[in-house]
């Protein structure tokens, strides 16, 4: 099934990309600000918009899980074997979804960061100064940083070197470090030299800073709501039947994409070196 999301005001502005086409340094529209009593002419005009906004297609991630009915019959106590195996498969789909949201060549966040929102590290390793520069790019209500665990460790070493250890915070029962009050969320989907788990101590990666939410014109996830056999947002599980060998089959389908609603909703720190270490006396 092909699912298409059209970026227009007709979809509740969900992924509205009819952004105002403004020249750099100009305001949205000329306005009148005057305390004089004379009859000044109030500026008028129209806001420019994209006549053919970008079209987002939902990416399909699917897999088929087979479960022998004998396993279900004999070993479903104390745990439901079908449920447990489906949950493992769903977790695998979610991991792949996370990777696609960051690295997909079409809608991935890394591929869609505007050039004006890309900055380089000062000296390779991610320093507090680098993250401060990143905040200047997403200064309107930033939600969180995204970084590989190796990049987070490299940043903590730089903080220790400068005597400014980052503060920690608790989110959903987990402890995360923060910088300037913004949590730094780990993900191995921001690859180091193209790998989730790099073999060597050195390597380069990227750090993202993101503002999320439609109301804030941030980064939003797209999914198909109201599907048949829907288990959660954008995810459906369909029973395909039992074959002659007594093997039950289930089709798992996940539809997803992402949109950046305004240029200043995301920024990236590029070429982050994770292999800088120091000796402390």
Which residue stretches match the model-derived regions?
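Alpha-helical scaffold segments that mediate packing/assembly in large oligomeric complexes
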Residues: 62-141
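Intrinsically disordered, low-complexity linker/loop segments enriched in Gly/Pro
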Residues: 40-69
């Amino acid at each position: 099934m092909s699912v298409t999301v059209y970026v227009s005001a007709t979809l509740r502005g969900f992924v509205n990309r009819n952004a105002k086409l403004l020249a750099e340094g100009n305001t949205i529209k000329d306005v009148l600000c005057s305390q004089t009593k004379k009859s000044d002419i109030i500026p008028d005009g129209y806001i420019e918009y994209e006549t053919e906004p970008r079209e987002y297609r939902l990416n399909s991630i699917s897999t088929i899980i087979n479960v022998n009915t004998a396993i279900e019959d004999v070993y479903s106590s104390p745990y439901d074997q079908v449920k447990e195996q489906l949950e493992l498969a769903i977790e695998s789909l979610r991991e792949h979804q996370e990777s696609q949201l960051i690295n997909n060549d079409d809608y991935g966040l890394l591929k869609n960061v505007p050039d004006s929102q890309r900055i380089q590290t000062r000296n390779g390793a991610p320093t507090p100064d680098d993250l401060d520069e990143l905040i200047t790019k997403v200064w309107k209500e930033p939600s969180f940083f995204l970084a590989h665990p190796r990049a987070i460790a490299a940043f903590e070493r730089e903080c220790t070197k400068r005597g400014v250890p980052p503060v920690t915070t608790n989110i959903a029962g987990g402890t995360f470090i923060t910088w300037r009050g913004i949590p730094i969320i780990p993900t191995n989907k921001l690859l180091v030299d193209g790998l989730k788990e790099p073999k060597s101590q050195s390597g380069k990666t990227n750090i993202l800073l993101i503002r999320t939410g439609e109301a804030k014109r941030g980064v939003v996830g797209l999914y198909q709501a109201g599907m048949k056999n829907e288990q959660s947002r954008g995810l459906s599980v369909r029973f395909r039947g039992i074959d002659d060998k007594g093997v039950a089959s289930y089709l798992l389908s996940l539809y997803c994409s992402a949109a950046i609603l305004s240029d200043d909703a995301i920024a990236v720190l590029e070429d982050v070196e994770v292999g800088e270490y120091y000796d402390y006396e």
